[in-house]
Amino acid sequence: MMDFDERVSVGSNMYLPSCTYYVPGADFSTLPSFLSQSPSTRPVTYSYASNLPQVQHVREVTFRDYAIDPSTKWPHRGPLAHCYPSEDSVHKECLPAVTTVGEMFPKNNASAYYHSTSNTTSASNFYGNVGRNGVLPQAFDQFFDTAYGGSDSVVDNDYAARDKMHSSKQSTPAPAPEQQPEGKERPETSSPESSSGNNEEKTSGANSGPRFRKKRCPYTKFQIRELEREFFFSVYINKEKRLQLSRMLNLTDRQVKMWFQNRRMKEKKLNRDRLQYYSTNPLL
């Protein structure tokens, strides 16, 4: 790599980045002609015509057209009294003369919050004497008397009426429940309908409305078919056959015995009904 001194013959008139000082101007003996001229004397060539009219400054034109002194300009936080009318004129225009109490306290009116100088005397006279309420003037005493006095009397009358009603309710005894004659109760207790089972059925029927009794069917269709077949051959069944049926149908000995008893009673009833039917109709 070549050194910087080898590449540059004259190093005294150059600025070296590695140096901590600048080369003084006396070392530069000669300067070009274009650097020695000042900006004011140096001619400048323009590509457009040089006979254009001179343009005035924008701020001077603005202040001159609007007749405002450019030296003072706009005051940023100065007093703005010249922009608004006087306070007295505003109060005079906003507030009319107050003549009555209703005008003194207008509802939802922004002018009620302004205090006019012409109305200070009437306001001071109105607020000067404080009434019995301690807050409102004496002019409101009549309204205070009618409002609070009337409400107190109404409340007292209401309490008196309630006390009278309460005392009358306590004085009148509650009517005793009517006692039913003993003659009706005894036959009901002695009758068979008043048993525990019948009473439960009555209460359940009364609570749930019309209720149909569920048909009891402890035997399946297959069991009933086999029992009916055995009953068709023999109305009475012996012990050996009963045990055989109970094992085959997965029933107890007592269940088979009870079924044959009920079936014989049913057959007897059917025979009786059949006999009665044919006796009433001899032609059949």
UniProtKB/Swiss-Prot annotation:
Binding region for DNA: 212-271
Pfam assignment, any one: DUF3528
Subcellular location: Nucleus
GO biological process per UniProt: embryonic skeletal joint morphogenesis; regulation of transcription by RNA polymerase II
Gene Ontology molecular function, alphabetical: DNA-binding transcription factor activity, RNA polymerase II-specific; RNA polymerase II cis-regulatory region sequence-specific DNA binding
Region (Disordered): 163-214
InterPro entries: DUF3528, HD, HD_metazoa, Homeodomain-like_sf
Entry superkingdom: Eukaryota
Entry keyword annotation includes Acetylation: no
Signal peptide: none
Gene3D superfamilies found in the cross-reference section: Homeodomain-like
Function noted in UniProt: Sequence-specific transcription factor which is part of a developmental regulatory system that provides cells with specific positional identities on the anterior-posterior axis.
Name of this protein: Homeobox protein Hox-A11a
Gene that this sequence comes from: hoxa11a
